Structures are given as structure tokens and as C-alpha cells.
Amino acid sequence: MPKYLAGPGGVAQGELTVPGDKSISHRSLMLGGIAEGVTDITGFLAGEDCLSMLRSLQAMGVRIERPEEQHVIVHGVGLHGLQAAAEPLDMGNAGTAMRLSMGLLAPQNFKSTLVGDESLMSRPMERAAVPLRLMGANITTHNGRPPVEIQGTPLKGIDYKLPVASAQVKSAVILAGLQAQGVTRVTEPAPTRDHTERMLRAFGVKISTEGPKVTIEGGQKLKGTQIQVPADFSSAAFFMVAGCLAASEKPLILRNVGVNPTRTGLLQLLLQMGADIKIGRAHV
């Protein structure tokens, strides 16, 4: 077993931009794919998880350009414009992509099969499948795990209380509700990240949040937009702590970090401990 020795540190100063937020990159691709018009994404996280989502959308007929590694242009096909893929959709190791895709594809008028790598094929998927089935979805898992087989069918809105707080399950139900008949309401037992809700509003969708309840009416169209994916807060966290601990004469500046209140628990804790952190305009 390898051993590591940590010695006294030096300075931690200068400027740094960490990679983009994976959750927002996933949702940017997915929502851009079902929007009408073009969605221009900068700051995209070009990691394998997000690229698995990108390739899956391409397999369903979405034209996607990549002028640069972190710059993606999605030509949306509209809410009902996706096409059946010729082969199973390989989500790699991306659990977020698989669970959100379950909600996205359950109301479509074709059959889909979702698979992944060895790790993803062992993860539970029933928590996302259960509420979707209550909406009328035809979803089959294998002992609760992938492959996930989806026979698209019309859905109806429901009122659903999440038994366990999960942003992924909440988002899957919201995406299904976006395409369902009637109104869908999701109530969560504890706050989770609300990227999906915020981003749907950016695409022109009316979605309301009242305390723990999220409400969306089906049939709304998305309009292509411009998205700047913020730097990932979790990736920035290590450097935030290092900057707080190091005895540096000059500051450490982390550029374009997303400070969604549902993700900044560490920031609040450091401030309570007396850390000298200044927050710029919607960024750390």
C-alpha cells in the first residue's frame, strides 16, 4: 500500500480556473438537444462522462459541433424530434446521464436501451424508474440495475414525494413531466441541487418552486440559448481550502466558480470559521 508524506506547504496565490461543472454540462447538452434552435455552450467539461451523453444525443439524431474542446454547439430537434438509436445508448460511467435519460426518453415514441461500463451496470436504477412508472412509463431493469429498457409511451403528470432526497431522480421526473400531459409536482424531503430547474427557466420553461415542491406543466417548448458552464465548485474546493491555509501575501483567485446555494456548504463553513474569502459577482 503506498504511503504519502505531507510536509509544510508554501504559498497558494495567483489565478486559476478549474474545469467546468459536470452536472451543468450534462444538462446543457440534454436540454439543448430537445430545444428548438441552437444552444451555444462554453466552459463545457469535456470529460468522458459528458462525452458519453454527447455521443448518445448524436446517436438519436442531434447535430452537435465542437469548434473547441470546451465549446459545444447543439442544434436542437425539439421536444419530440429525437430518433431511435440504432444501438444501445452507452452511458459509460455516467450515472447522471443514465438516470436523467430515463426521464427524457420515457415519453418518446420509440424504444431505447441504456447501458454503461462495468461499474455503471452494477448501480441501482429503480429509484428513478419507480416514479416514472407511476406516470405510465414502460421501463424494465435487470434486478434493479442496467441495462435499462425503455419503451416510449405517453405519460401523465403526477404528484410525487421523493422518499430519499435525490437531484437525479427529481430531475428525471421533471424531464418526464415536461413531456407529460398535465401538471407534475415533485416534493423533496431535503434540498438538493436545483440545476435542472434553473436551466429550464433559462430555456424559457415556466417551472415554479415553492419550498420543497417543484411544479411543471407538460408540453412547454424549449428555446435554444447561450450557456456558460461555471467552474465546478467541488473541484475548486481543494484550492479554496489550500488558499485559506497558506500564508500568502497575495490572494488566490478562482475564476468563474459556480456558487449555486445548493452546493456551497463548504464555502459557508469556511466563512463561519473566519476565512478571508470574497465573492465576486455570482462567482468565487
Predicted regions and their residues:
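Structural preference for solvent-exposed beta-strand-turn elements
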Residues: M1-R281
